[in-house]
C-alpha cells in the first residue's frame, strides 16, 4: 500500500509509479490511494473535499500503473464521532466503469455491513477493517481474567488472548464480502 493521497495528483502518481517500477520485477503488487479517506473525527468537514473524481481516477491508474486502487466514496478511517458514513454508490459505479484495476474500500470499520456488501456487489474487491478487528481483540483482552487481575501480560500473551476477537470479526467481514472459502481461514458454523 502506497498512500500518497495527501500529495498533488501529479506527485502522487509519480511516487506510486516509482514504487511500481521497484516492485513489479519482484512480483509485488502496488495498491495506491487516490482521493483521501477522512478520519472519523473530521468526517463531516472533510468527506466531500476528499471524494475521488472518477475521471481523474482513470487518469491516475494510467499514470501510476498501480495494481489496485483505494478510492474515497464517503467512508472514513476509525470510529465516526458524528454522523455515520454516507457512501456514494453512484460514484463507485462510475469509478468501476472507468478503471481496469481492482478497487479497495479503506475505512470499512463502522461503515456498516449493508454498505460494504453493496460496495462488493458493485465491484470492490478488498475491504480494510482494522479498527473494528482491533476493538474485538481488545474486548477479549479486557475481559480476560489475567488482565483484570493485573497480571503482567506481555505482547505475545496479549496477542494470543486477542486472537479470537480478531478472528471472529474478520470472519464476520468475510461473510459480508462473499470471501468465505476464498482464503486460508476456515469458518465453522
Which residues does each PLM region occupy?
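Thr-Gly-centered strand-to-loop micro-motif
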Residues: 105-107
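Small/polar glycine-rich anion-binding or flexible loop at a beta-alpha turn
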Residues: 109-115, 133-137
